[in-house]
């Protein structure tokens, strides 16, 4: 089996400086930059609403709740991902079903996804 490695984060000096500015402001959450980000991402995605959350786990959990996953449901997730992906599904009572990923994209294989679909799949 071939190992698929995660990549090094790409963080610019501008990003680092802005994070420093935010930390010095005393508002790590719900400050002016949070509102600005929500406004910009809403505009960029042409969405009616945008909301920030404290972590990817929280965002995934909210997404699973919005998708109305329930006990007895199965949700296909990538086999190579952060544990939060499967945990967010579990928090709703649903069961995560793992599908392998392809090299080099790291995306789930369509063939593997199709083989995992059952009557319980959401």
Over which residues does each language-model region extend?
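N-terminal "arm"/small-domain region of PLP-dependent enzymes with the aminotransferase-like
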Residues: 1-27, 32
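Alpha-helix N-cap/helix-start and coil->helix boundary motif
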Residues: 12, 57, 82-83
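Structural motif corresponding to alpha-helix initiation and N-cap regions
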Residues: 13, 35, 107-110
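Phosphate-binding glycine-rich loop
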Residues: 27-74, 88-92, 98-100
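PLP-dependent aminotransferase-like
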Residues: 65-122
């Amino acid at each position: 089996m071939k190992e698929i490695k995660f990549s090094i984060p790409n963080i610019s000096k501008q990003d680092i400086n802005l994070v420093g500015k935010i930390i010095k402001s005393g508002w790590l959450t719900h400050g002016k930059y949070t509102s600005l980000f929500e406004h910009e991402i809403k505009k960029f995605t042409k969405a009616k609403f945008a909301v920030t959350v404290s972590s990817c786990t929280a965002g995934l959990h909210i997404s699973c709740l919005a998708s109305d996953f329930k006990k007895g449901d199965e949700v296909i997730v990538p086999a190579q991902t952060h544990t939060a992906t499967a945990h967010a599904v579990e928090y709703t009572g649903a069961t995560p079903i793992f599908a392998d990923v392809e090299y080099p994209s790291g995306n789930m294989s369509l063939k593997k996804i199709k083989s995992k679909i059952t009557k319980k799949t959401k």
